Amino acid sequence: MKITRLHTYRVAPRWMFLKIETDEGISGWGEPVIEGRARTVEAAVHEFGETLIGKDPARINDLWQTMYRSNFYRGGAILMSAIAGIDQALWDIKGKALGVPVYELLGGRVRDRMKVYSWVGGDRPADIVQDMQRLLEGGIDTFKLNGCEEMALLDSPRAVDAAVAKVAAVRDALDMRVDFGLDFHGRVAAPMAKPLLRALEPLRPLFVEEPVLAEQAEHYPRLAASTSIPLAAGERMYSRFEFKRVLEEGGLAILQPDLSHAGGITECHKIAAMAEAYDVAFAPHCPLGPVALAACLQVDFVAHNAVLQEQSMGIHYNRGAELLDYVINKDDFRIDAGFIRALPKPGLGVEVDEERIVHASRNPPDWRNPVWRHADGSVAEW
């Protein structure tokens, strides 16, 4: 079998699908994208594609290493996201060719179902309780919401109190019927992270995500020592080499690599195994589309330390399309009592509606994240 062609499709809301075709008529799908930089990743995918044409798609490890190591400059969000989507599509091809789900190729399932959670509240959390109550009625009892809005390097105690008040309102309304993680989203700098974490402790969040930016990872051990809340990070780390450093230094209880940003299934399967050796949980980041989610689930079902899976149904970014709008086998993605079962179809387990994808790609979105500013006019972390 040989790779013959790569197609990319940018579609609403902010996703990009990749189709890799072969000379035997088997095609694989991936989801390589950086939210807000889709066109840049698209260029990288096609640049890698020039070296993939004519190659055997079954040699996934060799193709991965070739894409990663054959260029002097490597890594980073753009290149690793391009590799990630290609890698997903290659695993999809191999599973389809052999007639088995990818998790069978990775050694088989260690669990029967996977716990999932939903995003609520938007960039500036609002209507949180109503959103949670609606989803709770549908069987989802675990959530994530942004833990704060802009926060200056040194901010007023009032900013801490305002953030805590929003979270307290959720706990007061729903008590312990729900679990929720809080995403600081890199908005909080080290001087403010410690008092904010301390103030949130009585509300018993499941975890705090990106308590500080990944480039400030040296603060993770210090922050972990100051709080009982499990700390999580990883969506802005792109290879096992970056995760190696945070595992060695400690501080994180949960790793959250994104399988569309951190090298795909091949790389994130290794990251999960590394985390297990340090008694650290694995909870892939995935506010993206159905192919990305399907790729995450393949690793979730073989990684013993996988604890939670993010999924984007109803997320505030989904304007123009919902998670399953481009999926034919929607029933396979059904969530029951907060869990999803292993996808049974060969490959990644997602049957995409190619006709709808092609049609949607004729009017591609150009999504950009907003630029926020502090009260003094300086740029704030979004």
Swiss-Prot record:
Tell me the residue numbers annotated for binding Mg(2+).
183, 209, 235
| Necessary cofactors | Mg(2+)
Q: Which InterPro entries match?
A: DgoD-like, Enolase-like_C_sf, Enolase-like_N, Enolase_C-like, Galactonate_deHydtase, Mandel_Rmase/mucon_lact_enz_CS, Mandelate_racemase_C, Mandelate_racemase_N_dom
Flavoprotein as a keyword?
Answer: no
Which residues are the active-site ones?
Answer: 185 (proton donor), 285 (proton acceptor)
Instruction: Supply the enzyme class, top level.
Output: lyase
> Which reaction is this enzyme known to catalyze?
D-galactonate = 2-dehydro-3-deoxy-D-galactonate + H2O
The record's section on Pfam families has: MR_MLE_C, MR_MLE_N
Q: Which keywords fit this entry according to its UniProt record?
A: Lyase, Magnesium, Metal-binding
Site entry: Increases basicity of active site His: 258
What positions are marked as the site Transition state stabilizer? 310
**Which superkingdom does the taxonomy of this entry point to?**
Bacteria
Q: In which pathway does it act?
A: Carbohydrate acid metabolism; D-galactonate degradation; D-glyceraldehyde 3-phosphate and pyruvate from D-galactonate: step 1/3
Entry annotated with the keyword Nucleotide-binding: no
Which EC numbers characterise this protein's activity in its record?
A: 4.2.1.6
Further remarks about this protein from its record: Reaction proceeds via an anti dehydration.
Q: What does this protein do?
A: Catalyzes the dehydration of D-galactonate to 2-keto-3-deoxy-D-galactonate.
NCBIfam families xref list: PRK14017.1 (NF010624)
Q: Which family does it belong to?
A: Belongs to the mandelate racemase/muconate lactonizing enzyme family. GalD subfamily.
Enumerate the PANTHER family for this protein.
D-GALACTONATE DEHYDRATASE, D-GALACTONATE DEHYDRATASE-RELATED
HAMAP family per the UniProt record, alphabetical: Galacton_dehydrat
Protein's name in the database: D-galactonate dehydratase
What organism is the protein native to?
Variovorax paradoxus (strain S110)
What would be the name of the gene that encodes this protein?
A: dgoD
